Swiss-Prot record:
The keyword Phosphoprotein does not apply. The gene is aroA. This is 3-phosphoshikimate 1-carboxyvinyltransferase. Transmembrane segments: none annotated. SUPFAM superfamilies: EPT/RTPC-like. The keyword Transferase applies.
Length: 440
């Protein structure tokens, strides 16, 4: 293909095993936090490897609206913070980014003035009460649509008090919103999780000089401002998952993803791949700016079914759609439970993947909090309604590898720009051919 598709329908056709070495774009979670924490800091923050995608653009526009200056300089993104965050002059549009909206809700709760946070049609259907309730317990003045369930969110910033918050569901976004509000609060703020969620907020704040106390599943902060500094963003394991899962299940495949973030709160996928029998190894393991990274190689092998539940779920929640695809090629019954969080992402990902894979021939049973998939099952070509969800689109592009040459037609791929604009170019690079406009 001559150029990666950016919008409109797209037809994927299999072109043999996946082979090669690639680098995926910067981690989305770390990229968001780099910009936001830089805006909160007392000094300049310089970021390398920042993800260039729509979600991160939303955070950049938001911090600029709060008075930060963000510029590109010599291959780095430089964030110069204001002396104090200012009241925004207009509504802050977070686009499709739930991370932007939730983390900003925590920050703006402690910033004097009126702020309104909204987003696109998809974001305005995503729940915010789980953030509003704990922030209100700290004294935040917040309101939202539909009985405080849905965005837009209106924030009237003011004094906050520290509190001990026990979360019913492990969520890095909710945890981070509370901790960021805690930087503005009087007294200590503590978050207790039922399971460990991704810990980029804790690592990055500590790296910027904020005292962060971690004890088991408890995290505590007190009022402080980060000092700024340097952030080197590793590759995003959630983006790499499409290639790693495809390589694990497609005979003859071997893919290496270089400079990949392997923070232990994000490597549930690697544990699952090993449990299913794939060959997985890490090389060049090192730690940069507080985040471990490595070159990760996956080689195809005969996959066996496994169970995925409990503490593993928060460590691979975003990867589960493509794990569901991989499970169709594993021998036996793969069971995923405790993943109800999938129902409140950009789409109801359990329902979307279940319905689409079933039409493609998969033997799948859905539960309220997960699914069971029998395999191995040859898939067939299918037309996919992506629901404007980037992970549905990319997961079903991978599913096409197992369709025996039959095409998978995605109704619109513009959503891929949310997190991974170069996805189809890299997929082409490691051997899967795509074509645009519905043509083979």
């Amino acid at each position: 293909m001559s150029a990666a598709p950016t919008s409109g329908p797209l037809t994927c056709r299999r072109a043999g095993p996946l082979r090669g070495a690639i680098e995926v774009p910067g981690d989305k979670s770390i990229s968001h936090r780099s910009l936001l924490f830089g805006a909160l800091s007392t000094g300049e923050t310089r970021v390398t490897g920042l993800l260039d995608a729509e979600d991160v653009h939303s955070t950049r526009k938001a911090v600029e609206a709060l008075g930060a200056i963000v510029r590109e300089e010599g291959g780095e993104v430089v964030v110069t913070p204001p002396a104090t965050l200012r009241e925004p002059g207009d509504v802050i549009d977070c686009g499709n980014s739930g991370t932007s909206l939730r983390l900003l809700t925590g920050v703006l709760s402690g910033v004097p003035g009126l702020s309104v946070l909204t987003g696109d049609a998809s974001l305005r259907r995503r729940p915010v009460r789980r953030v509003i309730d704990p922030l209100r317990a700290m004294g935040a003045n917040l309101s939202a649509r539909d009985g405080d369930r849905l965005p837009p969110v209106v924030v009237r910033g003011g004094p906050l008090r520290g509190a001990r918050q026990v979360l019913p569901v492990a969520s890095a976004q909710v945890k981070s919103a509370i901790l960021l509000a805690g930087l503005f609060a009087e007294g200590e703020t503590t978050v207790v999780e039922p399971e460990k969620s991704r810990d980029h907020t804790e690592r990055m704040l500590r790296g910027m000089g904020v005292p962060v106390k971690v004890s088991g599943l408890e995290v505590s902060v007190s009022a402080a401002r980060p000092a700024g500094g340097r952030v080197d963003v590793p590759g995003d394991i959630s983006s790499a998952a499409f290639f790693l899962c495809g390589a694990a299940a497609l005979p003859g495949s071997e893919v290496t993803v270089r400079n990949l973030g392997v923070n232990e709160t994000r490597t549930g996928l690697l544990d699952v791949l090993r449990a299913m029998g794939a060959d997985v190894w890490l090389a060049n393991l090192r730690e940069v700016a507080g985040e471990p990274r490595a070159d990760v190689t996956v080689r195809a092998d005969r996959l066996e079914a496994t169970e995925i539940r409990g503490a593993t779920i928060p460590r691979l929640i975003d990867e589960l759609p493509v794990v569901m695809v991989m499970a169709t090629q594993a021998r036996g019954r793969t069971v995923i439970r405790d993943a109800k969080e999938l129902r409140v992402k950009e789409s109801d990902r359990l329902a979307a993947m279940g319905e689409t894979l079933a039409r493609a021939g998969a033997r799948i049973e859905l539960y309220e909090d997960g699914c069971a998939i029998e395999g191995p099952t040859p898939l067939r070509g299918v037309e996919v309604r992506t629901r404007l969800d980037h992970r549905i689109a990319m997961s079903m592009a991978v599913a096409q590898l197992f369709c025996g040459g039959e095409p998978v037609v995605l109704d619109d791929v513009a959503c891929v720009a949310t997190s991974f604009p170069s996805f189809f170019r890299l997929l082409d690079q490691v051997a899967a051919r795509v074509s645009v406009g519905g043509a083979p």
